Swiss-Prot record:
This is Adenylosuccinate lyase. Pathway: Purine metabolism; AMP biosynthesis via de novo pathway; AMP from IMP: step 2/2; Purine metabolism; IMP biosynthesis via de novo pathway; 5-amino-1-(5-phospho-D-ribosyl)imidazole-4-carboxamide from 5-amino-1-(5-phospho-D-ribosyl)imidazole-4-carboxylate: step 2/2. Its EC number is 4.3.2.2. GO terms for cellular component: cytosol; mitochondrion; protein-containing complex. There is a cross-link at K415 (Glycyl lysine isopeptide (Lys-Gly) (interchain with G-Cter in SUMO1)). The modification N6-acetyllysine is found at K147, K295. Catalyzes two non-sequential steps in de novo AMP synthesis: converts (S)-2-(5-amino-1-(5-phospho-D-ribosyl)imidazole-4-carboxamido)succinate (SAICAR) to fumarate plus 5-amino-1-(5-phospho-D-ribosyl)imidazole-4-carboxamide, and thereby also contributes to de novo IMP synthesis, and converts succinyladenosine monophosphate (SAMP) to AMP and fumarate.
Length: 484
């Protein structure tokens, strides 16, 4: 059955990434309009460079191409592709139809991957340029959150069991550190992208060498000129018909790594929401459950986790594609790449938009945190109590045994009776501990159990985070708005 249907209609499937989640600017980058406009721009750049280097191309032909870059007859292109079974040649003919004087020199010396691969590389670069400031904004919002709560003690968890205290700000810095690594990795891969350039059918530049009658220097100049017109600093020296598909592995790997970071962050937020210590933003009219009106589900964090799994899973596509590219090229990369590259960036875009929205409205409940600390801190403070008793003249061994017995009794109240931890009350009631009764409040001050967490937060933000965000200073004011 032939593919059909209007992608914008209710009767046709449309990717939820485009229909529900991703930003308009990211969707446009992967649209047919942007792709085919870029093909035409590449044909223009090629013709301009060929003319400059002496090929018989007129100013009139160049001007005709310039005037029709956006004049795309998509219906004609679709009919041509149906007839020719070749998307690039369909658009060569469509462009030539509105540029009759230039029709004979469009795509001169080039192969399909001249427009296909070079356009993909332009889109990948520009897509990174959309993601980077979004990620920087997420980091900035979380950095502000961490700074404001650098001193707020909270119960730490290892194995999701109560552990030594940390601070809310320090925990947030764990999230920020991962995202900073992602920001650096995305920027590195973006900056290392190289243009495929002007290489011909199998990467040998044979067609261009023939056009320039064996002049190797002009062929190299042509490659360099088009690369510079496209805004790239370097082009591959070696290609087959395509640029190596290992580039796609690099691109999707750093996006998947970002997905892993976001999944961890949003899982933490979901767990903290269950503990009622922290919540993501919850709108006034938002409904958590159709059956349970009291529910305040962390749906934004759940969405991030859901999409992050998809983003991480996409890395298998470029890995397998690169592994099966026989010799100079096989076409079984094409259909797969049409899906995975766009989906990876639209997914990453959605995740960052959503995480920015979360980070701009995180709510903390200090009283709940304080109550949980009170439940666990007495056990954690026992070593400090023993040390204080020894300093007051007591025996370490006798004190240890007293504490052990009282701790077991308090634990039984918590676990078997569902009561509160009353260890401190038991210590206050025991005359043995009278030498330190006046010290108990000080010994149980949560801030004395957080170590250097506040200092670590401020140093980390000042020395690592703020300098990393500096290049994005002009783009920090943008707020994240979610439609759904």
């Amino acid at each position: 059955m032939a593919a059909s249907g209007d992608p914008g209609s209710a009767e046709s499937y449309r990717s939820p990434l485009a229909a529900r989640y991703a930003s308009r600017e990211m969707c446009f980058l992967f649209s047919d309009r942007y792709k085919f406009q870029t093909w035409r721009q590449l044909w223009l750049w090629l013709a301009e460079a060929e003319q400059t280097l002496g090929l018989p191309i007129t100013d009139e032909q160049i001007q005709e191409m310039k005037s029709n870059l956006n004049n795309i007859d998509f219906q004609m292109a679709a009919e041509e592709e149906k007839r020719l079974r070749h998307d690039v040649m369909a658009h060569v003919h469509t462009f030539g139809h509105c540029c009759p004087k230039a029709a004979g020199i469009i795509h001169l010396g080039a192969t399909s991957c001249y427009v296909g691969d070079n356009t993909d590389l332009i889109i990948l670069r520009n897509a990174f340029d959309l993601l980077l400031p979004k990620l920087a904004r997420v980091i900035s919002r979380l950095a502000d959150f961490a700074k404001d709560r650098a001193d707020l003690p909270t119960l730490g968890f290892t194995h999701f069991q109560p552990a030594q205290l940390t601070t809310v700000g320090k925990r947030c810095c764990l999230w920020i550190q991962d995202l900073c690594m992602d920001l650096q990795n995305l920027k590195r891969v973006r900056d290392e992208l190289r243009f495929r350039g002007v290489k011909g059918t199998t990467g040998t530049q044979a067609s261009f060498l023939q056009l320039f009658e064996g002049d190797h220097q002009k062929v190299e100049q042509l490659d360099k000129m088009v690369t510079e017109k496209a805004g790239f600093k370097r082009a591959f020296i070696i290609t087959g018909q395509t640029y190596t598909r290992k580039v796609d592995i690099e691109v999707l790997s750093v996006l998947a790594s970002l997905g892993a970071s976001v999944h961890k962050i949003c899982t933490d937020i979901r767990l903290l929401a269950n503990l009622k210590e922290m919540e993501e933003p919850f709108e006034k009219q938002q409904i958590g459950s159709s059956a349970m009106p009291y529910k305040r589900n962390p749906m934004r964090s759940e969405r991030c986790c859901s999409l992050a799994r998809h983003l991480m899973a996409l890395t298998m596509d470029p890995l397998q594609t690169a592994s099966v590219q026989w010799f100079e090229r096989t076409l079984d990369d094409s259909a797969n790449r049409r899906i995975c590259l766009a989906e990876a960036f639209l997914t990453a875009d959605t995740i960052l938009n959503t995480l920015q929205n979360i980070s701009e409205g995180l709510v903390v409940y200090p009283k709940v945190i304080e109550r949980r600390i009170r439940q666990e801190l007495p056990f954690m403070a026992t070593e400090n109590i023993i040390m204080a008793m020894v300093k007051a003249g007591g025996s370490r061994q006798d004190c240890h045994e007293k504490i052990r017995v009282l701790s077991q009794q308090a634990a039984a109240v918590v676990k078997q009776e569902g009561g509160d931890n009353d260890l401190i009350e038991r210590i206050r009631a025991d005359a043995y501990f009278s030498p330190i009764h006046s010290q108990l409040e000080h010994l149980l001050d949560p801030s004395s159990f957080t170590g250097r967490a506040p200092q670590q937060v401020h140093r980390f933000l000042e020395e690592e985070v703020r300098p990393l965000l500096k290049p994005y200073g002009n783009e920090m004011a943008v707020k994240a708005e979610l439609c759904l």
